[in-house]
């Protein structure tokens, strides 16, 4: 295997939306960094039965709805 071509693989802390933390290894960030999740399996509508609304982060959902609002409408 070639040396010095692989990214640094180190320990980080992942913080779930409910505050739960766990340790894992990743190439993200630096050793000891915390990765705060906005959506995780406990809060994502796909895994919770869709009872919660998806956050409109940066207006993306609004732009999509505006762009395709008339796509399936019949005249």
Swiss-Prot record:
Keyword Ribonucleoprotein: yes
Database matches in SUPFAM superfamilies: L28p-like
GO molecular function list: rRNA binding; structural constituent of ribosome
GO BP, sorted A to Z: translation
One GO CC term on file: ribosome
The keyword Ion transport appears for this protein: no
Family: Belongs to the bacterial ribosomal protein bL31 family. Type A subfamily.
Assembly: Part of the 50S ribosomal subunit.
HAMAP family xref list: Ribosomal_bL31_1
PANTHER family the UniProt entry points to: 50S RIBOSOMAL PROTEIN L31, CHLOROPLASTIC (PTHR33280), LARGE RIBOSOMAL SUBUNIT PROTEIN BL31A (PTHR33280:SF6)
Protein name per its UniProtKB record: Large ribosomal subunit protein bL31
Species of provenance: Rhodopseudomonas palustris (strain HaA2)
